Regions:
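Conserved N-terminal subdomain of the carbohydrate kinase-like
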Residues: 1-53, 208-230
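Conserved structural-core and active-site-/substrate-pathway-adjacent residues in large, well-folded domains
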Residues: 3, 52-55, 102, 170, ...
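Structural motif
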Residues: 21-23, 50-54, 82, 100, ...
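Short, basic, glycine/proline-bearing loop/turn elements
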Residues: 23-26, 55-57, 104-109
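Conserved phosphate-binding/catalytic region of the ribokinase-like
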Residues: 29, 48, 65-80, 85-95, ...
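Long hydrophobic segments that form regular secondary structure
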Residues: 51-54, 60-62, 67
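Short glycine-rich anion-binding loops that position phosphate/pyrophosphate groups of nucleotides
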Residues: 57-60, 87, 105-106, 140-141
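Non-cysteine beta-strand/loop elements that form the S-adenosyl-L-methionine
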Residues: 96-104
Length: 231
């Protein structure tokens, strides 16, 4: 069970905004038996799934063996896998179709790899771990897609007044799963993920959700931007 705390100071800001997030959970890892049971349960649900999202909190729920077995089984079944990995457990994501990163995380790996820029770091990581693509979430800096074939696409953030960013990973993972699971291309999936992230950035609070009309407006704006930039 994870307990989440939020803190902020409204006197310093024009609007209320989350400044601090602290998560508290059990310190001990789960037993291997529980992890194996959860993996087996996920494996049995593959036939009824159109996509798989694996999110690693490094608490023992997702082991390297379990993650790789799910990725292989999904690949054999033609089911796309979206992975939200820990930087210290990238081996668990080997072979995933799409991997989520924050811009700060990629910057850290860039320094570790001594790459000249984030593009080179992304290329190195994609080749090393055999990913299909990497989607980098930059918040107000937009979303960048790096693909195994070398193609790169950047989607700038068009949110007029970004308020918060709690939930970006969940929004992006859900959008990728919905798009890839319904047979859309990786670029289309990244576009939907960017729109979902902008909805989160513009939400009054992390519990606020948008309807289909609002999301459609974001997608129309992104489509127009891509059209005028010949992307």
């Amino acid at each position: 069970t994870k307990i989440r705390f939020y803190g902020g100071r409204e006197s310093l800001l024009d609007k209320s905004q989350i400044l601090l997030q602290a998560d508290r959970g059990p310190g001990e890892e789960l037993t291997e038996g529980i992890s194996a049971s959860l993996t087996a349960s996920a494996m049995s649900s593959l036939s009824d799934s159109c996509a798989i999202v694996l999110s690693d909190y490094d608490k023992g729920v997702l082991t390297t063996e379990g993650a790789l077995s799910l990725i292989k089984a999904a690949g054999d079944a033609g089911i796309p896998v979206i992975m939200d990995p820990k930087l210290t457990g990238l081996e668990k994501s080997r072979g995933a179709d799409a991997v989520l990163f924050e811009i700060r995380g990629l910057g850290l790996l860039q320094r570790r790899l001594m790459a000249s820029d984030q593009s080179e770091a992304a290329k190195n990581l994609i080749e090393t771990y055999e990913w299909g693509a990497m989607l980098v979430l930059g918040g107000v800096h937009g979303v960048t897609l790096y693909q195994a074939d070398g193609e790169t696409m950047h989607l700038p953030c068009s949110a007029v007044a970004p308020i918060q960013q709690i939930g970006l990973h969940d929004a992006a993972a859900t959008a990728l799963a919905a798009a890839l699971g319904n047979g859309h291309s990786m670029t289309d999936a990244a576009t939907l993920a960017a729109a979902a992230c902008e909805c989160v950035l513009s939400a009054e609070a992390s519990h606020e959700f948008v309807n289909r009309t609002t999301l459609g407006v974001w997608l129309d704006e992104l489509a127009w931007q891509l059209q005028i930039s010949d992307r």
